Swiss-Prot record:
Pfam families: Cpn60_TCP1 (PF00118). It catalyses: ATP + H2O = ADP + phosphate + H(+). ATP binds at residues 44, 98-100, 495, 500. Its EC number is 3.6.1.-. One of its GO terms (molecular function) is ATP binding. It comes from the Eukaryota. GO terms for biological process: binding of sperm to zona pellucida; chaperone mediated protein folding independent of cofactor; chaperone-mediated protein complex assembly; positive regulation of telomerase RNA localization to Cajal body; positive regulation of telomere maintenance via telomerase; protein stabilization; scaRNA localization to Cajal body. This is T-complex protein 1 subunit beta. The gene is Cct2. The modification Phosphoserine is found at residues 3, 260. Mg(2+) binds at residue 97. The N-terminus is blocked. The keyword Iron-sulfur does not apply. GO terms for cellular component: cell body; chaperonin-containing T-complex; microtubule; myelin sheath; zona pellucida receptor complex.
Length: 535
């Protein structure tokens, strides 16, 4: 019998790459920890910002401390790093805030796992311990949650505190009170629906952030056509996505040969008649306002003006979609059956000035909760970051209106969970207890990083905070204004229960997924097949 060759056999295509066992695990740990280190300096009320500069001729500049935005705009090649980037994006989509916290917690868990594996503790043992730790942490968080949903005054104060806590780590922190009030008023107008599409945010250069305001209505950043009414009461609105520029022949590759200018005039006349018929079909809907996503050329604009109809062109797709939502209409593309088209309505449409720009204001819209937040600022970067910050606050508030449970911030919740996990580890025999203790240590790293970013002695503060929780002061947290331990209930540093819960579960799941990896296989790049049949 022939002996088997001991030479390694490569079963992959040429160009494919494979990392095995410790090499694969180390590669995953390094990538994930690097992502955590990248964003951890942005954590907390005194976190730093990042400048993101895209390459190319039209290099865009972005200044932000939003974890999801940073990770979304950096290109990562490491598979484990991509897992954390995707997790951060999901956190942003689900609850709107906690994107940096979830990334940092997952990275710290993997940092702890790296040292445990170096001590010859099996990944499955670590995962088993982490699952028990996650369960204990979630129960501790749930038991500490406070629900003021039935008390209107206290719930309103909770919303103000949550918005203030969310904005305290953002660019808007210096105008926190102003924007907290704006965000809470806007979300309470939704009457519990949580439909953030009804809140429109417009950015206008000029003035300062303090000049931003909430407008009870809908603002469209467009201009009304020439020689048309600038104000309409009891508006009936047809919202359309149709071509109103057919003053040219639109047959691909067509050519027309004429032997006189009279023939050219005939073609133009035919085109005008065709457009006139289309405008007449639109006017049969009994409207006094026509809003089109596409361009409206001069001739149809004149026809609308002569009929006393306000025509608004080039309302971008997002604007048209939101306008259909708030006015109660539907977007139409054909106009042969007026009875099938649902028109939008509002009490008043008028042109208004903001700074040096003209906008169209819709008031008394069908969707009564619709409103617009107008952001003012000195530079485009400030406006963009203000919009991102406000979006986070609005998402968290909408989530809190649905689930009114709140927990305390300032590292209080993390220390509370860490204390519960440590107590469980002390009662658990075997190596799983070591994994549980590592989970608690990772949770304690969040208040440590918050204190470090503020320039305080994190070792001293976290030791004091840990001692306070051990003595039963479950509302103790970090007061980053004074650099001491404070009572979060008194300071009003409150966060949404759903945000904290999502941070805990997402980070634990992502860390577990990465820890399970013992092989990374990169597929061979696809080769281009030469085209043997050129056109």
């Amino acid at each position: 019998m022939a002996s088997l060759s001991l030479a390694p056999v490569n079963i992959f295509k040429a160009g494919a790459d494979e990392e095995r066992a410790e090499t694969a695990r180390l590669s995953s740990f390094i990538g994930a920890i690097a992502i955590g280190d990248l964003v951890k300096s942005t954590l907390g009320p005194k976190g730093m910002d990042k400048i993101l500069l895209s390459s190319g001729r039209d290099a865009a500049l972005m200044v932000t401390n939003d974890g999801a935005t940073i990770l979304k705009n950096i290109g990562v090649d490491n598979p484990a790093a991509k897992v954390l980037v995707d997790m951060s994006r999901v956190q942003d989509d689900e609850v709107g805030d906690g994107t940096t916290s979830v990334t940092v917690l997952a990275a710290e868990l993997l940092r702890e796992a790296e040292s445990l594996i170096a001590k010859k503790i099996h990944p499955q043992t670590i995962i088993s311990g982490w699952r028990e730790a996650t369960k204990a942490a979630r129960e501790a968080l749930l038991s500490s949650a406070v629900d003021h949903g039935s008390d209107e005054a206290r719930f309103w104060q909770d919303l103000m505190n949550i918005a203030g806590t969310t904005l305290s780590s953002k660019l808007l922190t210096h105008h926190k009170d102003h924007f907290t009030k704006l965000a809470v008023e806007a979300v309470l107008r939704l009457k519990g629906s949580g439909n953030l599409e009804a809140i429109h945010v417009i950015k206008k250069l000029g003035g300062s952030l303090a000049d931003s305001y909430l407008d009870e209505g809908f603002l469209l950043d467009k201009k009304i056509g020439v020689n048309q009414p600038k104000r309409i009461e009891n508006a009936k609105i047809l919202i359309a996505n149709t071509g109103m520029d057919t003053d040219k022949i639109k047959i691909f590759g067509s050519r027309v040969r004429v032997d006189s200018t009279a023939k050219v005039a005939e073609i133009e006349h035919a085109e005008k008649e065709k457009m006139k018929e289309k405008v007449e079909r639109i006017l049969k809907h009994g409207i006094n306002c026509f809003i089109n996503r596409q361009l409206i050329y001069n001739y149809p604009e004149q026809l609308f003006g002569a009929a006393g109809v306000m025509a608004i062109e080039h309302a971008d797709f997002a604007g048209v979609e939101r306008l259909a939502l708030v006015t109660g209409g539907e977007i139409a593309s054909t106009f042969d059956h007026p009875e099938l088209v649902k028109l939008g309505s509002c009490k008043l449409i008028e042109e208004v000035m903001i700074g040096e720009d003209k906008l169209i204001h819709f008031s008394g819209v069908a969707l009564g909760e619709a409103c617009t937040i107008v952001l003012r600022g000195a530079t485009q970067q400030i406006l963009d970051e203000a919009e991102r910050s406000l979006h986070d606050a609005l998402c968290v508030l909408a989530q809190t209106v649905k689930d009114p449970r709140t927990v305390y911030g300032g590292g209080c919740s993390e220390m509370l969970m860490a204390h519960a996990v440590t107590q469980l580890a002390n009662r658990t025999p075997g190596k799983e207890a070591v994994a549980m203790e590592s989970f608690a240590k990772a949770l304690r790293m969040l208040p440590t990083i918050i204190a470090d970013n503020a320039g305080y002695d994190s070792a001293d503060l976290v030791a004091q905070l840990r001692a306070a929780h051990s003595e039963g002061h479950i509302t103790a947290g970090l007061d980053m204004k004074e650099g001491t331990i404070g009572d979060m209930a008194v300071l009003g540093i409150t966060e949404s229960f759903q945000v904290k819960r999502q941070v805990l579960l997402s980070a634990a799941e992502a860390a577990e997924v990465i820890l399970r990896v013992d092989n990374i296989i990169k597929a061979a790049p696809r080769k281009r097949v030469p085209d043997h049949h050129p056109c």
